[in-house]
Structures are given as structure tokens and as C-alpha cells.
Amino acid sequence: MKKHFAKQIFAAALAISFVCGLSACREREEEQLTLKPVIYLYPEEETDVSVTLAYDGTLTCTYPNYKTGWHVSAKPDGTLTDEDGQTYNYLYWEGTDSAEYDLSHGFCVAGSDTAAFLENALRDLGLTRKEANEFIVYWLPQMQENPYNLIAFQSDCYTQVAQLDISPAPDTLLRVFMAWKPLEEKVDIPAQTLTAPAR
């Protein structure tokens, strides 16, 4: 059975900017394809922001074009404007990597309960309703029909695999990573405690 992973990058800056990303990865032989990672920027006032990604893998797609990094003007509502005057809702990238994730702790959730679980879990991890909605509408169709989903939030490993360098630097940084795979039967695993810093 293929392993399915959903990754969530999340970083918050109370004084300068707030950064949030949504992504996923799927194992293909020795590599995993990281799907739909996005980075949101929310400064307190309009700010020029540079974002670089040190990814322990190979980038396969970026939008806007990554080049040597992203350089945008970010507004408090999250609107990003690049050097060519184009506007975006977020920064997007995809890639392949061979990271290994631990699913020994987390949650076993019935497929039919996945939407409600994600609403609560993503709220507890500090996402806004808009950010959680973006995450859920992308992943729910792949999860809700499974008998069960094994879900584990793992920020430490993902922080090492996909390091973000943001300038100006955030005051607070929170990385959230959700790994998951479908199950035919329910399993008992130790539950995780989900917390988030103030934003």
C-alpha cells in the first residue's frame, strides 16, 4: 500500500508577518512527491519580504517562479505583489524528497469523521478558518471515503526537510506538518496534544 502524507507548514510572526503553508507528499518508490505546498504572508503593514526555501529534495514546480527565492511586497490582507507587478494569494512550490515520517503517535479517524476532525485539529494548531478551509477542501476528497485515516502531526522532521528563511524574520515561528495514510481497520495509537502559540 502506498503511504499518503499531507504536510502543513505554518509559521507565525506576531510583529512582522505571519506565514502559513499547506502541502502534502506521496511516496513513489524511493521518493515522495510533495504536493500543493503554499506559503501565506500577513505583515502588520505593507512590507517587502524575501522568502528562501532550503529543501532537502528537488523542486519540481514553483509559482511565482522561485529563481533564487521569492521577493514580494506583502499586505496585511495577504495579497502578494512580485517584482513584475503580478499579484498572488500565496507562494507555491512542489518537489520530491525521501524524508521518513513517524506515524507511531497521532490519531486514527474514521473517513466520515475526517472533516470535523481536521476542522478542530487545524483550529487547535492555530490556523484561521480561511487557511483551514484551503487545507480541508484539497485533502478531504482523498480522505473521506477511506474506512479510516491514520493522521500524525510532525513538525520537527518537516522543519529539517523544508527550512524557510524569511526576511524580515518572524518573531514567532510555528511549523505544523500533518502526515497521513489510509487504513482498512481501526488501530489504537497514543494521541498527540495539539497546541499553537498566540498569533
Q: Which residue stretches match the model-derived regions?
A:
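Hydrophobic helical h-region of N-terminal Sec-dependent signal peptides
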Residues: 10-19
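C-terminal motif of bacterial Sec signal peptides marking the signal peptidase cleavage site
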Residues: 20-24
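Protease-labile, long low-complexity intrinsically disordered regions enriched in Pro/Ser/Thr
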Residues: 28-199
